[in-house]
């Protein structure tokens, strides 16, 4: 009996902590369970999702451009993908839950921008509580965060690692760390959208887990 108990304890001690769920989108098919492509004519070829913004659809959807969505429930997250924006006015990467939670916006704020100057600046926004017309969230502007002209026309790797109320964001050679209560909220959607121009995406990979909120984090 003691031998059996010892073996069970050894197995429990040696067992790895449950890994997060991994989701890979290789963009080789128009349809994939766990991914939605909306508000535009998305093309999926050779492992790349791409779309050219349609001005008429942009107006139809009340100034919202083509979007890719990956719905899944999670708290912590490690996500990475590569994107190539060509003459876009803005590219927006958002984590949603009960409303918006965390957003990364790259914008072209030049007066002579191909699609016109973006009214929305390059920035991060975090919502500690449910977003609304009254709750615009907290704006974060890390130093040296690249804008769209800095990455226009080339493939750029984007990574976001969220653990509790802390996150590390990487865009190309740029990296910043964020600590905010918003990051600890329950999440249920990853979204990538853009306005004007053309956006291509490849090598999308996400590992997520349903760990409880890390109350001990500052």
Which residues does each predicted region cover?
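Short, solvent-exposed beta-strand-to-loop segments that form ligand-recognition rims
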Residues: 171-191
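Ligand-recognition surfaces built from glycine- and aromatic
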Residues: 185-218
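Beta-strand-rich interaction surfaces with strong enrichment in secreted/lumenal proteins
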Residues: 65-71, 93, 144-150, 190-191
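Extracellular carbohydrate-recognition regions
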Residues: 19-39, 213-218
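Short, aromatic/His-centered strand-loop micro-motif at the edge of beta-sheets
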Residues: 133-157
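Secretory/extracellular carbohydrate-interaction modules
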Residues: 57-132
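Extracellular glycan-recognition surfaces and repeat-rich motifs
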Residues: 31-60
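Short tryptophan-centered beta-strand motifs in secreted/extracellular beta-sheet-rich domains
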Residues: 27, 79-81, 153-163, 167-171
């Amino acid at each position: 009996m003691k031998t059996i108990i010892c073996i069970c304890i050894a197995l429990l001690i040696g067992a790895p902590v449950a890994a997060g769920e991994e989701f890979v989108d290789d963009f080789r098919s128009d349809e994939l369970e766990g991914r939605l492509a909306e508000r535009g004519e998305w093309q999926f070829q050779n492992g790349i999702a791409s779309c050219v913004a349609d001005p008429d659809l942009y107006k139809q959807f009340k100034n919202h451009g083509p979007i890719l969505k990956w719905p899944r429930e999670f708290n912590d997250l490690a996500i990475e993908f590569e994107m190539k924006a060509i003459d876009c006015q803005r590219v927006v990467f958002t984590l949603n839950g009960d409303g918006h939670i965390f957003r990364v916006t790259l914008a072209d704020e030049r007066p002579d921008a191909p699609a016109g100057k973006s009214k929305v600046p390059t920035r991060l926004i975090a919502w500690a509580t449910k977003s609304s017309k009254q709750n615009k969230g907290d704006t974060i502007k890390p130093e040296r965060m690249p804008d769209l002209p800095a990455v226009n026309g080339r493939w750029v790797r984007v990574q976001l690692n969220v653990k509790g109320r802390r996150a590390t964001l990487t865009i190309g050679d740029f990296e910043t760390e964020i600590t905010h209560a918003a990051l600890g909220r329950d999440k249920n959607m990853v979204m990538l959208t853009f306005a004007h121009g053309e956006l291509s995406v490849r090598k999308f990979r996400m590992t997520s887990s349903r760990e409880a909120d890390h109350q001990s984090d500052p």
